Amino acid sequence: MATAAACISFASPSPARVVIRRQTRASASASATDRQEVVSPKRRLPLRKVPGDYGPPVVGAIRDRYEYFYGPGGRDGFFAARVRAHRSTVVRLNMPPGPFVARDPRVVALLDAASFPVLFDTSLVDKTDLFTGTFMPSTDLTGGYRVLSYLDPSEPNHAPLKTLLFYLLSHRRQQVIPKFREVYGDLFGLMENDLARVGKADFGVHNDAAAFGFLCQGLLGRDPAKSALGRDGPKLITKWVLFQLSPLLSLGLPTLVEDTLLHSLRLPPALVKKDYDRLADFFRDAAKAVVDEGERLGIAREEAVHNILFALCFNSFGGMKILFPTLVKWLGRAGARVHGRLATEVRGAVRDNGGEVTMKALAEMPLVKSAVYEALRIEPPVAMQYGRAKRDMVVESHDYGYEVREGEMLFGYQPMATKDPRVFARPEEYVPDRFLGEDGARLLRHVVWSNGPETAAPTLHDKQCAGKDFVVLVARLLLVELFLRYDSFDVEVGTSTLGSSVTVTSLKKATF
């Protein structure tokens, strides 16, 4: 089976080539080993010039933008066409938004599992202000601060801010499972009411409310519905996120209108200032204990507030808004046989643990965990990663080495890396038991939704998601709650601006 990391060689005046093994500064030997073993550093692949071109200034970028948003096959088709045209999974192209939002849209695109992981190595790539790609939204949308997602690990504030997020996710850890079950139990009750009343239930609408309520109650101990924020939180967050990501989104408007308003101009932050201020006021009060911890770490209180808001609203709520419908979509399509296997596993593990959902019970549900990993593989919630080369180097695909120069922007389209047919059999299929057993465990290092391999743990010195394990946990809890209650379910699937639109059309209650 093909391997999945980039082997990097530094260009040097000396005829000798120094090969750098990929390794984090994490103290855990398992994480370091996982990152090194993804590819053998002894390979010497033939060098090839990175194919592709950027076209004329401005015109080439606009051409690529139109093809990306409006061409045949959508964005998957945009990248697949480049791979076919150049017979290469490393190519030069322009990434949206381009003119007149991004100063320089030119990237070297990494479109396979072998080249993609170079983006995780912060000794080789700089991550400064690259969270959203070739442009950065105005800091007016984040209280005037560059929040953690935009910081490179070399910056002095990165470590204390990431430490604060680890604290945020862990300081009420005993409340996570019971609060999730309470909030999402209510969600399924509301969905049953909708099914009885109108014959269908919009999972996304109910999930938005439940996700925000759970995050605030589980991690902060505050119910936003009982604050001045009321039930407006999800609506305010969605609008705020739109203003940050609009240059990268398609809303289904007429092409010329959409491309002019969303992709060529920035939406004015002033239009969402009142909404953002309402969110910030809530978190100043609700997150006082976490802000106090931030102050102890040397973080100014206001900076802590805006980082907590971003972490919970953009990263965590945004992640659950995309991932949970994705998970329900793929499982809904998997059918009753898969549902039966999951229900049997979930109910057996809970029964064997005194009827309680505990971490021990969850550990006895390997199929549930595999089903979550498979959703994260086939449709990762964040599809794109960026990094700027810190020095001249050679990035390797499966077959060739490509010289990249210092300062060039590297871009990875994750769905092509995690559906690489040289790594995954039946890559376009959702296979819920893909990660079971020893062979499945070996594949986990190629699951990289968290901006790092699933087999590695996030540290203060990398950009791997601080909430990596939390996200997998709550996704597993969703399946546990679902299959404790129901034997099977049916869905209708559509598209939405962020992720999938999922309507549940039936819920078959548990019979065993």
Swiss-Prot record:
It catalyses: (13S)-hydroperoxy-(9Z,11E,15Z)-octadecatrienoate = (9Z,13S,15Z)-12,13-epoxyoctadeca-9,11,15-trienoate + H2O. The gene is CYP74A1. It is found in: Plastid, Chloroplast membrane. GO terms for biological process: defense response to fungus; jasmonic acid biosynthetic process; oxylipin biosynthetic process; response to jasmonic acid; response to wounding. It comes from the Eukaryota. Pathway: Lipid metabolism; oxylipin biosynthesis. Its cofactor is heme b. It is an enzyme of class 4 (lyase). Involved in the biosynthesis of jasmonic acid, a growth regulator that is implicated also as a signaling molecule in plant defense. Converts 13-hydroperoxylinolenic acid to 12,13-epoxylinolenic acid. (13S)-hydroperoxy-(9Z,11E,15Z)-octadecatrienoate binds at N315. It holds the Pfam family p450. Residues 1-25 form a transit peptide. GO terms for cellular component: chloroplast membrane. Its EC number is 4.2.1.92. Keywords: Chloroplast, Fatty acid biosynthesis, Fatty acid metabolism, Heme, Iron, Lipid biosynthesis, Lipid metabolism, Lyase, Membrane, Metal-binding, Oxylipin biosynthesis, Plastid, Transit peptide. InterPro entries: Cyt_P450, Cyt_P450_E_grp-IV, Cyt_P450_sf. Expressed in coleoptiles, and at lower level in leaves of dark-grown seedlings. Belongs to the cytochrome P450 family. It comes from Oryza sativa subsp. japonica (Rice). Induction: Transiently induced by red (R) light, far-red (FR) light and abrasion in dark-grown seedlings. Not induced by FR light in phytochrome A (phyA) mutant. One of its GO terms (molecular function) is heme binding. Heme b binds at K127, H158, K162, K463, C465. The lineage of its organism: Eukaryota, Viridiplantae, Streptophyta, Embryophyta, Tracheophyta. Residues 23-43 are annotated as: Disordered. This is Allene oxide synthase 1, chloroplastic.
